[in-house]
């Protein structure tokens, strides 16, 4: 130990052991409270407002949408689920500790990682109660019927937590510009149908569903069928149905390619 640092350390220890006048104790308590307050912030979640650590270093994520957003914001995620087939997220999965799957968290692995904050949402939020017993946990599930606005709100929340507000504002401006361009391009171009394909099964999604709400709402492409189901994994349909409706545009999500 260098002499100067040694004497400084001794001075700090002596000061800590010395009795404080009542007034100084009050000031010290107020300073500690202010410091603790500065280290946390209150953010909106799907379960109401929550107090979270500000700019936590050890973060575990059980929501792929949040993982995508955090990666785009340049936030390091130390732990997440087993990999999924999203090419640009593979570097994240390779570096991060695996703490289970979206539907089955590995609580032993999570405890070993010792996160300061756990972020969940969507299907992963089913494990919220148990996750919250292990660490501070927030549910950032987006509103399926309002994906764009809800997604931007999620991005804003994450940006506040990690001090990335400026970057988030730039991303929002880019997103807004893309939506405006696409909405203009879609005007008068017919009607659309959003489908999900799993093997030989085909499902169609309603205007307020998780896969179609932004296409029909934010882009403004009219649907070929207003009666389609909005909940869950869509409404099973046949090829005859598709032929009968005869959409001008078909948007297909290949679920088999995504999850295997």
Region spans (language model):
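A short, structured surface patch at a secondary-structure boundary
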Residues: 58-112
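Soluble non-cytosolic domains of exported or imported proteins
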Residues: 60-61, 104, 121-125, 145-152, ...
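Binding-cleft/active-site segments that stabilize strongly anionic ligands or cofactors
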Residues: 92-140, 186, 191, 197-260
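Bacterial Sec-exported substrate-binding components of ABC uptake systems
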Residues: 2-7, 17-64, 166-195, 255-260
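Short, acidic/turn-prone active-site loops that include or flank metal/cofactor-
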Residues: 82-86, 124-125, 141-146
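Extracytoplasmic substrate-binding proteins
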Residues: 133-200
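Extracytoplasmic/secreted envelope proteins and their assembly/folding machinery
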Residues: 53-56, 63, 67, 71-74, ...
């Amino acid at each position: 130990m260098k002499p100067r640092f040694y004497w400084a350390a001794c001075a700090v220890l002596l000061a800590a052991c010395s009795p404080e006048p009542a007034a100084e104790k009050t000031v010290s308590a107020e300073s500690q409270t202010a410091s603790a307050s500065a280290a946390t912030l209150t953010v909106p979640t799907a379960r109401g407002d929550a107090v979270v650590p500000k700019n936590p270093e050890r973060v575990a994520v059980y929501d792929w949408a949040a993982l995508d957003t955090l990666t785009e914001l340049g936030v390091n995620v130390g732990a997440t689920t087993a990999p999924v087939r999203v090419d640009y997220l593979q570097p994240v999965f390779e570096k991060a500790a695996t703490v289970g799957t979206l539907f089955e968290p590995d609580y032993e692995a999570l405890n070993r990682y010792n996160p300061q904050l756990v972020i969940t949402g969507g299907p992963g939020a089913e494990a919220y109660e148990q996750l919250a017993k292990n660490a501070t946990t927030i549910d950032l599930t987006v509103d399926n019927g309002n994906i764009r606005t809800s997604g931007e709100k999620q991005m804003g929340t994450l940006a506040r937590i990690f001090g990335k507000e400026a970057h988030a504002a730039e991303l929002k401006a880019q997103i807004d510009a893309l939506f405006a361009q696409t909405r203009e391009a879609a005007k008068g171009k017919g009607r659309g149908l959003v489908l999900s394909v799993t093997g030989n099964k085909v499902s169609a999604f309603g205007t307020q569903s998780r896969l179609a709400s932004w296409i029909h709402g934010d882009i403004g492409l009219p649907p070929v069928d207003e009666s389609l189901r909005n909940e869950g994994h869509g409404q099973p349909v046949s090829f005859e149905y598709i032929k009968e409706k005869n959409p001008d545009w078909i948007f297909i999500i290949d679920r088999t390619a995504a999850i295997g």
